[in-house]
Structure formats: structure tokens, C-alpha cells
Amino acid sequence: MNAKALYKKKALRDRRKLRIKSKLLGDALRPRVSVFRSNRYFYAQAIDDVKQSTITHIDGRKMGFKNTQEDAKKLGALFAEELKKAGIERAVYDRNGYLYHGVVAAFAESLRENGIAL
């Protein structure tokens, strides 16, 4: 990809991100689960938007997981356990401008399978 195409791709993601965030709001009972995926790793965090604080997070890089669908499912199961320890059973899923496909979708499905209502 040339520089112009990369710029357009990032600009489109930023527009999606703003559109999504304007509609989502998390609180202590139903936090916002925000995900970030790089080319190599996957990260997620549960955010209380009222207090502007992170409740819990998971770091795929520190745990040795790569940015694959299988690893996203494993991370989803581990993150669901962390959320349950924090007393959270419902959340709002913030895909952070990424398309709901592949790793982002696998992580969300894994959270649902492990008892977190999104």
C-alpha cells in the first residue's frame, strides 16, 4: 500500500471510531469493553466511563498470545474470568473502529460463550 491509501484507511477507521464512541457509554455495572489489535498482538480493557477509569485489562503480548482467532478466543475466556472476578456480568462492546470480523468477532463471541452479556 502506498502512503495515500494508508492515510485513507486510517481516516476511515477514525471516523468509524468517533461514530461508535458517540453512541456507547459504560458505567460501573455495565462497563465498555474496548479492544485494540495491532498487526501482532491483541489487547482489551473494561472501562468505566463515568469515573474515567479502567476496571480490568488483558494484554495478549505479555501472555504470549498472537493476533489470531484461536488466541483471541483464549483471551476472551481469560478476560471473561477477570470480569467475573470484578463482579461484572454485562458489558458494552466497543470494537474501536475495527470491522466486526475475524479476531474482533472471535473475542466477542468468546466473551458471550463464557457468560458475559454484550
Curated annotation (Swiss-Prot):
<comment type="function">
    <text>This is one of the proteins that bind and probably mediate the attachment of the 5S RNA into the large ribosomal subunit, where it forms part of the central protuberance.</text>
</comment>
<keyword id="KW-0699">rRNA-binding</keyword>
<keyword id="KW-0689">Ribosomal protein</keyword>
<keyword id="KW-0694">RNA-binding</keyword>
<dbReference type="GO" id="GO:0006412">
    <property type="term" value="P:translation"/>
</dbReference>
<comment type="subunit">
    <text>Part of the 50S ribosomal subunit; part of the 5S rRNA/L5/L18/L25 subcomplex. Contacts the 5S and 23S rRNAs.</text>
</comment>
<keyword id="KW-0687">Ribonucleoprotein</keyword>
<dbReference type="GO" id="GO:0022625">
    <property type="term" value="C:cytosolic large ribosomal subunit"/>
</dbReference>
<dbReference type="InterPro" id="IPR005484">
    <property type="entry name" value="Ribosomal_uL18_bac/euk"/>
</dbReference>
<dbReference type="GO" id="GO:0008097">
    <property type="term" value="F:5S rRNA binding"/>
</dbReference>
<comment type="similarity">
    <text>Belongs to the universal ribosomal protein uL18 family.</text>
</comment>
<protein>
    <recommendedName>
        <fullName>Large ribosomal subunit protein uL18</fullName>
    </recommendedName>
</protein>
<dbReference type="InterPro" id="IPR004389">
    <property type="entry name" value="Ribosomal_uL18_bac-type"/>
</dbReference>
<dbReference type="GO" id="GO:0003735">
    <property type="term" value="F:structural constituent of ribosome"/>
</dbReference>
<dbReference type="Pfam" id="PF00861">
    <property type="entry name" value="Ribosomal_L18p"/>
</dbReference>
